[in-house]
Amino acid sequence: EDGRIRVIDREVSAVQGAGMIRGEIKNIDLVSRSIKEAVDAIGERQGIRITEAYAGISGQHIRSVKQPYYVFASRGGEIRQEDVRQLHDSMRNVPAPEGEKILQIIPQNYIVDDEEETANPVGTFGNKLASTFNIILGDSVAINRLEMALKRVDIVPLGLFLNAIASAEAVLTPDEKEEGVAVVDIGAGTTDV
């Protein structure tokens, strides 16, 4: 509804023993068992079979780097949606450092002709569209373990997202995000900001 996600059910299933340590999977069997318990409980209550999912990830292996990039306006000096798309597509082709995978690429701002900063450049006039992107990286092994844990219980991972960003999206207003309000998510083994 209106592009918003509506939570219809939830289930908590703790990972037993040393299956997870500080947000990282150490024992795939224990984590898979916990995922299966939660998914089966929800499936039974809702009368559905869950076969695919988006999964959240956190841990000490997560880091971010800033990467500037720019493109030139495609037509007549007006920035169009296709220019923004081209800028984003160019960033998707940036290779991850060895041993890491890109989890998310987030534009921090847009700048038109090295002068005007804007949240939405579409419809502005200029020849050059630039942005600084925040690239969220995670350790390949940690990411692969999460994907393996899902696949072991016949769940296709549709994508991964950073837990800290999901928490912020869930509780902060656009104004609070613009003002730089931080969300501190204190968990059993990790604290995400």
Positions of PLM-derived features:
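Nucleotide/phosphate-binding catalytic cleft detector across ATP-hydrolyzing
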Residues: 1-183
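A generic beta-sheet turn/junction motif
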Residues: 186-188
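Short beta-strand scaffold segments in enzyme catalytic cores
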Residues: 1, 191-193
